[in-house]
Amino acid sequence: MAKKLKVGIIGVGGISESHIAGYKADPDTELYAFCDINEKRLHEMGEKYGVTRLFTKKEDMLALSEIDAVSVCTWNSQHAPCTIAALEAGKHVLCEKPMATSEAEAQTMLEAAKKNNKLLMIGFVRRFGNDCKIVKDFIDNDTLGDLYYSKATYLRRQGNPGGWFGDKSRSGGGPLIDLGVHVIDLTRYLMGKPKPVSVYGATFQKLFDRPDCKDRPGYIATSATPDDVCTVEDFATALIRFDNGSVISVEASFSLNIKEDVGRIELMGTKGGAKLEPELELYTDINGYMADVTLKRSTALSFNGLFEQEIAHYLACVRGEAECISPAEDGVTMMKILDAIYKSAETGHEVIL
């Protein structure tokens, strides 16, 4: 019988529970240790999941030689130091998205993984969605032809989650780095991961967290308090141009005066188009007639089992049973894109990569 993998979690905030569910679903994995600077939350989570090895310092947890792999689920500014420390301690790492708060940090993380010969996987969880797999099946079978223009949209009307998400020193940015990263990555992944060559972007801080709004925000972080600051953008838009001539148009917001929240990607190709919002629609021509096509089966993203699939893939990679489909190199490219959007927004000029 194979030895059980022992896993540690660094950062036991809201997103960690999705990782934990994935680990608990694997009979050959043991949830071994938790680490968090918030002692109250740490002990609550330890009691909830029956984990007794609890640490407030990552170095103490990572000193446990029996730990094989780690999930890094901290706020964004701690992704790099926690990931690098884990890799240097000889652990495999699954780091939540975004990989870091800058391309430079991300590159250092990648180098640490290579130096220590350990897996570094980035939590681009949308790649594991049922909707992604269906669209990719159509793309791989050339149903859409050459993809040359796409839209990546993630808009919230009133969705500033508070907590560390609005604090730029911890988050690295607002909806672009928190929400936009999901749809940018998913869209680029489906387009075949072309190389970005230039970016033009703009960011706005107009509505903040709507302090006078009497309606409850739609999304609230576990770390939210009445004293939270909001030093990030509330809306971002960008055009990303790639080496094959294709373009992605991006929109992401925490707060925006729109009718309702929007989460969709749109792909336009030479043979057809596709839209996920949330059900898949295909646009093509059949026998010379314009046709809109939907599938009999549900194609909307299902969160049921989404993170479990991501974790299962991570564990398979750790065991040498699979090749990682969400590697650190893709995280570095994403940070290059995000850095360029923020730089373009600051300077008012296109950024050549």
Stretch-by-stretch model annotation:
Residues 1-49:
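N-terminal Rossmann-like dinucleotide-binding module
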Residues 95, 120-122, 151, 250, ...:
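Hydrophobic residues in well-ordered beta-strands that form the structural core
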Residues 33, 53, 69, 149:
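Short, Asp-centered acidic motifs that coordinate Mg2+ and/or phosphate
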Residues 1-4, 9, 29, 69-72, ...:
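C-terminal helix-rich "cap/oligomerization" subdomain common to oxidoreductases
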Residues 51-58:
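Conserved SAM-binding strand-loop segment of SAM-dependent methyltransferases
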Residues 64, 69, 75-76, 80-127, ...:
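Beta-strand-loop-alpha-helix segment that lines the small-molecule cofactor/substrate pocket
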Residues 11, 126-229, 348:
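Predominantly a Rossmann-like dinucleotide-binding segment in NAD(P)-dependent oxidoreductases
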Residues 185-281, 309-316, 320-322:
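Contiguous beta-strand/loop segments that form the cofactor/metal-binding neighborhood of enzyme cores
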